Amino acid sequence: MCIPIHPNLDSTMINHPLFVRRERVPGNKKEVAVGSCATRLVKSLMWGSLLLVSAAAFADNAPLSTQIVDLANKVDGVHPGYRAFHAKGVLVEGTFKASPEAARLSSATLFNGGSIRVTARFSDGAGVPTVPDGTPAMPRGIAIKYHLPGGADTDMVTNSFKFFPVGTGEDFRDLLTAIVASPPTAPHPNKLEQFFGTHPNAPKAIGSLPIPDSFADEEYHGIDAFIFVNKSGQRQAVRYVVAPEKLVHITAEEAAKLPPDYLFDDIAKRIAQKPVVFHLKAVLADPSDQTKDASQPWPDDRKVVDLGVLTLTKVVPNSKEAEKKLLFLPTNLTAGIELSDDPLPTVRTAAYSVSFGRRSQPGSASSN
């Protein structure tokens, strides 16, 4: 029987990886779920920890990025050679061609109208490389590396969250601390329920995640705000959207009947048959819109500009090996695109870098 976590959470959210702790059974190489809905198979959290440790574990003043990676490795285990976040993924290649409107908004080289080679990575938003693709309330992602003329790169990191559960790295750590302090046996209201009470967009963000029928049929959002600067010096705050040609979601019941790797099997078959096409779009902020808090969505009526077409044509051979060398960093920008006052890109880049450094050491933790 599932233990209610929060009055606004339905059964799908209760089964979300955030609320299911995994342990290893002696003599069994597989991880099993314990706690709420313990009969479910391996689940993973997007970022987080369910281990029963206190916030005092961070009394050594470790950097925030280190705390986040430590928690991620503790909850999902260390999987050498895999990323600590979005562990299960596949690399694809293709091109991007910008629209004329993109160049009016930003002087960035990738918007000059030429064909830009790209390497992209589709992924499940969990830290376990064997997580079933149909796991409910789990974000899916696409990270894109644009290979610019002259040899430089710039990155975009997007996922299926329409907005993030929290707005700062500190709030994310506090969310993890609340999860840590809220085992199934904790009295109610537990720390997680209290956190949701003061951060109402957190359960809304997690509960709004759909299940796609294909990576090709999902919409991905750049939850953070960036600043476009055009040749005249005009500045415009934007949030990215990577939009499919069609958007198709399925129910949890339908997903449960599919193979555990159905998203990855499907994308390989689709690209082999014909290119997979997305439209890169920018949601334009109104001068009155805040840019600092990724947990606060902008109004739905904001202008959306089509920046260009992303055409994916090939799965990278030996993708698992190839992706180990790649980092997709939200702060890896190019002239014409700048950071806003949103703190999360810097926090994410720092965490990915910590994790990458650990993976680079033989026998150590995985990374992004």
Where are the language model's segments positioned?
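Basic polycationic patches enriched in arginine
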Residues: 21-24, 40
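Bacterial N-terminal signal peptides that target proteins for export
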Residues: 32-46
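Intrinsic-disorder-associated, low-complexity terminal segments enriched in Asp/Asn/His/Tyr and depleted
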Residues: 6-10, 15-16, 28
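Active-site-adjacent core segments of small-molecule enzymes
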Residues: 60-368
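Low-complexity intrinsically disordered segments
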Residues: 2, 9-11, 36
